[in-house]
Amino acid sequence: MIGVAATRVENRVFAALGLQKSDISFDSCESVEYGGVLFLLPFLLANGLLSYKKYYSQRHSGYYDFDSVILTLAFMYLCRIKSVEQLKHYSPGEMGKLLGLDRIPEARCLRGIIKELSIQERACEWNAYLSEDWIDHEDTSIYYIDGHVQVYHGHLANLGKKHVSRQKLCLPGMIEFWVNNADGLPYFYVTGQVNEKLQEMITTQLAPRLLELTNGKVSQQELDTDELLPRFTLVFDREAYSPSFFRHLWESFRIAVITYRKNVKDKWDEKDFSAYDVDTEVETTMYLCEKDVELNGVKMREVRRLTETGHQTSVITTNYKLSTILIALYMFSRWTQENFFRYMRQEYDIDRIIQYGVDEIDKTTMVVNQEYSNLTQRLKKLREKKARHQAKLYALVTENIKGEMEQTGKNIEKQLCFRQEIELFEAEEQEILAQRKQQPYRISIDKMPEHSRYNKLKTESKHLQNIIKIICYRAETAIANLLTAHYRKGSNEIRALVKSIIFTKADIYPDYKSNILTLRLNSLATPRDNMAINEICQTLNDYEAVFPGTKLKLVLKTATVTPARDQEV
């Protein structure tokens, strides 16, 4: 048994003998499931999907080469098939038609080929290459940084607990620190080892990597000429707030920051705020005010936004080149990165554990001592008990002063009981403090008890597949941006329309004489959608994308051509 839809028997026999790989050959087909996914192929290739070849060695034998597997994974994720296991429930022959094959790899075969890629351990290098290419083409100097926790519910790994804001709980997991642009498009991410804080990761990994990727975008001569010019600007939330940290970034790297200010006590006069018209998805008005401020000896700019309720949201920055309105816009655009995390969780299942197994952590890594933390927790609970007893004692003393003489005896007895318990609490408190004093606050991993010693999940395969998911997201965004131009208002429905295109059947017609692969998309749900997709076909065809492994140029068409109307879609 070769398998369902395995029609190219001779090729498979030759591949099994190591004589040849699969040939990419398209047949004329009508109404192919998920045919619309090929509309995203030009953007997948433009975003570097096949640039993996610069870092990964190709397979020497086997029916499927790495190109077919990478394309299979990309199409799989775009079709919202979130794991290799789920492929078992989809027609392998229909998916194979999209790749010019008889069928896609069986789940076990696909896992094996992914493992062949993963053991080469080149995901970080590939991601670095892609990041540099994207940054060069997008020409941005604003980078958004935030952590995303991948919650772990298993028992194999001992992971430190992280605060998961979306669940408002501290749970075991691994934290990924992502770098995105102002539109939410991701560049790269770094996985923390244990419980690293955002400040630490920016200093040790994210800032050095961004400096390397942006090397030369701002020359040293420009920096020397203009003392206020930053290399680039980082935008993050209050987690990394620290004026001394901001000074370190500026003095050591010439990196500016934009973030929310913590512990704002005062209010500015509302008469100082001016109205600014802001054009986002809809035109809105912001009431802003800017003043210079000095915090812990660090001079910064503070911009506040006045809301309708009278609340003043404070934003601070060390960037003196941006206008007031841009500072506010960049800070309040952080929601694009949050939306990216939510979309990737829901649509691409980015938190899924892909590779089982654990790796050891560098034994010299310093972590918070669990014994110290346990004693601190005991001390906190004990002090809470003592505070409650002191409050009750105070109430009894007050009652005794104001009460009647007949109740004084009973009242004093109760007071005595509370005083005795408080004394016991104080004695226990001193004992815990003495025990905690003997424990160091931080210890190295190798000094942790073996049964609770931290380790980490294997990440190479997940990193590889996350890169493909990032490219898929960027391809989706690119076609969504094209569609937005043909609508009166940009809306969240654009993403739904892109999904609708992907899920729509299409006809495939190869012409090997002219080296053209024509894809004709079936009708979408509404004339408005048909008109929009028909309008962007020429733009997509201008990319002149050639299907990988062939000389066939992709030509995209729609089956329904809606006549132009006066009204705007």
Predicted regions mapped to residue ranges:
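Dynamic "connector" segments at or just before major functional cores
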Residues: 1-169, 174-227, 430-569
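An anionic, glycine-rich sequence signature occurring as long contiguous blocks
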Residues: 9-11, 247, 252-337, 345, ...
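Short, solvent-exposed helix-loop connector elements
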Residues: 54-60, 162, 317, 325-331, ...
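Short acidic, glycine/serine/threonine-rich loops at helix termini
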Residues: 99, 153-158, 244-248, 269-272, ...
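Acidic, metal-coordinating catalytic cores used for nucleic-acid/nucleotide bond scission
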Residues: 234-244, 263-266
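C-terminal, active-site-flanking charged/polar segments
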Residues: 256, 323, 331-367, 422-425, ...
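Charged, amphipathic alpha-helical linkers/stalks
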Residues: 343-401
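Extended alpha-helical coiled-coil "stalk/arm" regions
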Residues: 389-440
